[in-house]
Amino acid sequence: MARTKHTARKSFGGKAPRKSLATKAARKVFPVDGQVKKRYRPSSNALKEIRKYQKSTELLVRKLPFQRLVREVAQEIMPNVRFQSAAIQALHEAAEAYLIGLFEDTNLCAIHAKRVTIMPKDMQLARRIRGERG
């Protein structure tokens, strides 16, 4: 039987070949002091972050950017308006409380749809159920 030349072809689909243990071991970072740094899974880091922010009471949106936003919106409605610092603080607290509640409802909508990732449609549904316009 005669030999024929085989030309290289592009592969479409299928599983990628697994990386060997040598390449995985070479990728690990070893600190100078000799101890191997434990790397946490992304899901456990996310859960740790959720617990941290649920325990805390400090505001999550920075003060100065929020203040600039409030002043910018107020300038469009009524120029030369002044704010007391207590008024901006009250607006800040109210805005964060609203956002936290909205994200909680959005998360419930995502869970109801048997998902763990929130999507814009979850937020739209949460706002519609709340009866908000806009």
Curated annotation (Swiss-Prot):
Q: Where in the cell is it found?
A: Nucleus; Chromosome
UniProt keyword annotation of ATP-binding present: no
One Gene Ontology molecular-function label: protein heterodimerization activity
Q: Which residues carry this modification: N6-acetyllysine?
A: K5, K10, K15, K24
Mind telling me which InterPro entries this protein's record contains? Histone-fold (IPR009072), Histone_H2A/H2B/H3 (IPR007125), Histone_H3/CENP-A (IPR000164)
Does the entry feature the keyword Acetylation, yes or no? yes
Functional description taken from the UniProt entry:
Putative variant histone H3 which may replace conventional H3 in a subset of nucleosomes. Nucleosomes wrap and compact DNA into chromatin, limiting DNA accessibility to the cellular machineries which require DNA as a template. Histones thereby play a central role in transcription regulation, DNA repair, DNA replication and chromosomal stability. DNA accessibility is regulated via a complex set of post-translational modifications of histones, also called histone code, and nucleosome remodeling.
Q: State the source organism's domain of life.
A: Eukaryota
Residue pairs linked by disulfide bridges in the UniProt entry: none
- UniProt keyword terms in alphabetical order: Acetylation, Chromosome, DNA-binding, Methylation, Nucleosome core, Nucleus, Phosphoprotein
Record Gene3D superfamilies: Histone, subunit A
Q: Which residues carry this modification: Phosphoserine?
A: S11
Q: Which family, according to the similarity comment?
A: Belongs to the histone H3 family.
- PANTHER family hit by this protein: HISTONE H3
Post-translational modification note: Acetylation is generally linked to gene activation.
Record PTM N6-methylated lysine, positions in chain = K5, K10, K28, K37
Organism equals: Caenorhabditis elegans
Gene Ontology, cellular component aspect: nucleosome; nucleus
Instruction: Name the chain's protein.
Output: Histone H3.3-like type 1
Per UniProt, what is the name of the gene that codes for the protein in this document? his-70
Q: How does it assemble?
A: The nucleosome is a histone octamer containing two molecules each of H2A, H2B, H3 and H4 assembled in one H3-H4 heterotetramer and two H2A-H2B heterodimers. The octamer wraps approximately 147 bp of DNA.
Give the region (Disordered) as residue ranges.
1-25
